[in-house]
């Protein structure tokens, strides 16, 4: 099976292709620009993206949106994670967290899949904490400052396989693949 992944983020493509490729699913990246609305929930961003893209890109296609939600910052950066990363970066988040005792945070991923005129969503959440400093060279985005529960490593200190086993995106991909097995008999 071939799925078109609409994203300009090569890190996401590597993770998705690594996970789904083990099941013989080919991921083809399409860098088709589409508006990302500012909404309160990742699900709304994905719904809008699918609605905008259908009929403009080949099927079946998928999109993914994710966010980092930090408890002591009342869920910030959340749905604005991409914008915040581009503007204040990891250094800005670490500065905002200076002196914070509560470093709990979670990543959430929402995958949207469109096939045969229907849209489906799959999500995954990973709890963890924000480190005191950047660590690691793998991954992308907030990976160097996020330590998932049950680990002492940041996502950026893990191999792609280790990260996919624990990450929000890995959990969403697992739910997606389970759905594919049942509904498309894959």
From Swiss-Prot:
Keywords: Hydrolase, Magnesium, Manganese, Metal-binding, Nucleotide metabolism, Nucleotide-binding. GO terms for cellular component: cytoplasm. The active site is at 65 (proton acceptor). It comes from the Archaea. Binds 1 divalent metal cation per subunit; can use either Mg(2+) or Mn(2+). InterPro entries: dITP/XTP_pyrophosphatase, ITPase-like_fam, RdgB/HAM1. SUPFAM superfamilies: ITPase-like. Substrate binds at residues 7-12, 66, 140-143, 163, 168-169. Mg(2+) binds at residues 36, 65. Its cofactor is Mg(2+); Mn(2+). Its EC number is 3.6.1.66. HAMAP family: Non_canon_purine_NTPase. Belongs to the HAM1 NTPase family. PANTHER family: INOSINE TRIPHOSPHATE PYROPHOSPHATASE, INOSINE TRIPHOSPHATE PYROPHOSPHATASE/HAM1 PROTEIN. Pyrophosphatase that catalyzes the hydrolysis of nucleoside triphosphates to their monophosphate derivatives, with a high preference for the non-canonical purine nucleotides XTP (xanthosine triphosphate), dITP (deoxyinosine triphosphate) and ITP. Seems to function as a house-cleaning enzyme that removes non-canonical purine nucleotides from the nucleotide pool, thus preventing their incorporation into DNA/RNA and avoiding chromosomal lesions. This is dITP/XTP pyrophosphatase.
